[in-house]
Amino acid sequence: MLRLLLILLTVVGVVIVLVGVTSKLYRVPTSSMEPTLHCPKDDEIPGCRGDDADRIVVSRVWYRVRDPERGDVVAYELPARGVRRCGAEPGATFVHRIVALPGDRVEVRAGVVRIDGRRLEEDYVERGRMGGPSFRSQVIPDDKYVVLGDNRAQSCDSRAWGLVDRDDIIGPKIATYWPEDRISVR
């Protein structure tokens, strides 16, 4: 029995170390990714209730073995121009969805994304959350990405400050671990 307990504790310890080395944990600080990632509003205070916000696990190694894909929800370091436009702290980490890849011709109007002239199907964006600024038609250069919040009307994203460099992408969201009623993988 003691041997089984030691094996179990060793396995748990190894998992904790691996997660710590290969992943990073974040709390969702805004409603920009609603309804995919939740940050409940509070009428008494600006912003959202941090204690009830989704907590996510982001892989720091995933993009070492594969390229980012359209639809990935990613954490990234906000570029300097985004810090100014969004009123964020330098070094801030944002979480949004990749909607355009290098080589795509992308345009965003009234929250609707068009890739190479065709409307991008986005079942994760609710009709009432469309809108926000536009993004003029352009071809995305190598190692650059367009990221948007699923709550287009309330998101400070690529439409406000431009493209995200691949080197600034920390990694994709691989799990939601809090609150317990929203636990999910990928």
Q: Where would I find each of the regions flagged by the language model?
A:
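Soluble "head" domains of membrane/secretory-pathway proteins
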Residues: 2-186
